[in-house]
Amino acid sequence: MNPATLTALPTSDTTLRTLFSIGFLARFSYALARNPVLPLFAAALGAGPEGIGLAVGISTVTGILFKMPSGALSDVIGRRRTMLAGLVVFGLMPFAYLFITHYAALVAVRFLHGLATAIYGPVAMAVVADIAGARKGEMLSWFSSVGIAGTLLGAPIGGYLLFLLGGEQAGLNSYRTVFLCSALTGAAALTLGLFTLRNGDKPAEGKNLAQRIHLFTQGIREVVADRRVLMTSSMEGIQNMSMGALEAFLPVYAVSMAGLNVFQAGLIWGVQIVVTFIAKPLMGRISDRWGRRPLIVAGMLLCAVPFALVPHLTDFVVLMLVGMVFGLGEAFVTSSSAALVADFCKARHYGAAMGTFGTIFDVGHAAGPIVTGLLVASLGYGAAFAIVSTLLCASIPLFLYTVREEPQTANL
């Protein structure tokens, strides 16, 4: 492990438990303040559809801009300092929602709140890669699943709190109560981080500012010059594009075209997330033992086929099954891609690698609803979903040609 990382932290198992606990609290806090509370709050401030979309999506822009430099910075100044910076945003920024009275302020706060995941996410993943050894796939999958659990709980609890406080007729004070709960949970994540990450990073001896800047830029250059890293990250980005498209348009299709009710549409989407949540750690363990490329390829196919079928189905049970298959495919891809990126990188560049991976992930997530929306408007659901499905399949031969799996000891 790079001396500038977490060499001064407690044992590996303790560190992993700490990261999982902090990750759960942080994602739970973030989800409380996001869906469905955030779009409704933006509407209450007078935002139209475009404004609501900007308020929800602006934090993804933050991730695109800052994940790579945050990860690379952690390679230079240490993981602990960088993670705590992200936790400070998690812990303090939600309090800013309590003072928002205008839409422009909401957009600004959302942009800054996005720094929390942009800073903490890739650095925490780098720490997991640092200490997981040959179990990168399994441990990175557990870290991701814990975050998914926080999101799964945070979103409905936030919505239920708002329902108790007035629902669609809730006033600004009702929204502020939910945001206060988010702030307190984020503060709990920060407090846990301050106590459990109390030991300092081991300083990089003999490094002045110019040398640190050189290490920072060198890490980014070496990572982005590795086409294996970029291609593997792109597979995750393309899969995430289809997931973002499904997230945006599956509920609309289910209600407006398939004739299902809103609750059924939510169940179809929810079962996909639950399957991903359950399957990821197992798929990560399998990728550690049997290789990552086969799982990524199989996962892309498992996502492509059900994605293309969705516009041709109207039965609730069948759509549920299709959603489950897509969720399994997502687990195949996401359990292996981040670990494969870490396999290709030198340990001292794990931060930059996870930052690059996270940036491409966010680009895919942001592009999915936008690109698919344009395609649906121009060509309809059937052709639009077929095009995205074709992109998933077309990426496979390029991935197999570009990426050759190597023994994991190559990066030590």
Regions found by a protein language model. Name each.
Residues 2-13, 198-232, 412:
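Juxtamembrane intracellular "pre-TM" segments in multi-pass secondary transporters
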Residues 11-60, 230-235, 240-258, 265:
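Helix-loop boundary and gating motifs at the non-cytosolic
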Residues 57-71, 270-282:
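Central cavity-lining transmembrane alpha-helices of secondary-active solute carriers
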Residues 78, 99-105, 133, 259, ...:
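Helix-breaking motifs and short loop linkers at transmembrane-helix boundaries and internal kinks
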Residues 81-96, 294-309:
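Structural signature of the two symmetry-related core transmembrane helices
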Residues 109-148, 339-340:
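Cytoplasmic helix-loop-helix junction between adjacent transmembrane helices
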Residues 143-195, 382:
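Helix-loop-helix hairpin linking two adjacent transmembrane segments in secondary transporters
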Residues 183-205, 395-403:
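C-terminal membrane-cytosol helix-exit motif in multi-pass small-molecule transporters
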